[in-house]
């Protein structure tokens, strides 16, 4: 039995600070061991949308505790982490820089690889986290100003069927993916 990788994921692309520990089962399917999310909705509510500087400041204040809680809740030890991944974009640059800087420093301190993750690709693949969904599949990705209709053909293989720059609300908050079975 080979050792399954343990990945620490960090997300700070907009107004949520999040950390998760993920591994895989014997079949190679992802297993989420912990997923800690701190929302900033209350911080930005009075402004009618996300204020990037306030969002970045909140990430800086919370990221240590969020990552520690993700590790604690996973039941695993920090020494068991095999790699650290952080969202690299698209997103608000001041927010992304918090997660990227923290993730790179954390990986460096552990002498582990660092993985920069495309925010939209993460959304495109997230339906596979909790299902036996097979490629190809159709995906409606609604994320701020990057809404797309995709044929997800495999890891790194996407065909854009349509796109829209329209926000879904005054705040570019991510909306979870909707999916339909593909007949292709």
State where each predicted segment sits.
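General beta-strand structural signal in soluble alpha/beta enzymes
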Residues: 86, 94, 114-119, 160
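Single conserved hydrophobic/aromatic residue that forms the stacking wall/gate
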Residues: 167, 172-184
